[in-house]
Amino acid sequence: MTTSLHIGFIGAGRLGKALAWSFSAAGLHVAAVASGSGPSGSANASTSARELADATPGCEAMAAQAVVDRCDLVFLATPDSAIASACAALRWRAGVSVVHCSGVTEVDALSAARDQGACIGGFHPMQTFGDPAAAVASLPGSTITIEAGEPLNATLVALVGQLHCRVNRLPPGMRARYHASAGFTSQFINALFAEAARVWESWGATEAEALQAMLPMARGTLASIESAGIARGMPGPVSRGDVGSVEKHVAALAALSGHSLNFYRTLCASTIPLAVERGSIDEDTARRLHAVLETEPLQAPPESRLQGGPASPASQPVPPLE
């Protein structure tokens, strides 16, 4: 049972803190933590490790090797570039498991532990961790991508359930592609808001005023996507076949300096196949829109997106253990 696990963390940054606190709040035993800096962790616990331990009942700060020696399951929450070297610097054994928390790094980066008999895997929460305390509150309901063989896979699935999250299983070799996909709905949103705010600034509005207006609209769009799906939940003139409005947008943005017009053309063109998919515009309207945008038609997305319905088997909610 996961409740009997001694869980350890090597790396006490924002991700390590958020996961450790989440596990502890779920009734799991986070027994030890070490700094992720240095080849094998500092013999004297770093300030961040001590802070994490002090805020986690039953947890002690110690050197990285001591974490491995004490715990059944070790989370390697170091920067991506340090995963392989941090793992290789430690002595592992049969009966212990180690997982890294990177979305982009392959699990084979932990091969040094596997070669010594340990089980290895990946455990990547699809959530942002700018503020660890806020991340603890936002983690339930999120998806956690796991990759491991048995018996570690079953343990990780149970842990995801304890956190009231969803499991996403990833086959080997797909981590970079998977992690890139997350960017479209994470940091790329910042670029979209930045571009919109720059347009608002052209008439003297501030970024704060732009955000105050745009955030409720963005939340409404996300709610529509959640309830109706990607294509059917899309608002805006393209979804209505309003070629005239798009023409006016192009003319207005052409008068601005910078790359706003090219950005608009690229994004607007990518919504045309979605409007065709949902059946709200015909092929002739799609061609007219592309002509206004001076873009080439894109391949239409698969029809399966129209189906809505339950989540795919790869991303289902997992009930918590009793």
Show which residues each predicted segment covers.
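NAD(P)+-binding Rossmann beta1-loop-alpha1 motif at the extreme N-terminus of oxidoreductases
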Residues: 1-63
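Phosphate-coordination loops involved in phosphoryl transfer and adenosine-cofactor binding
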Residues: 3-4, 95, 141
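Structural signal for conserved beta-strand scaffold positions within catalytic alpha/beta enzyme cores
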Residues: 35, 63, 100, 122, ...
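Rossmann-like NAD(P)(H) cofactor-binding subdomain of soluble oxidoreductases
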Residues: 55-134
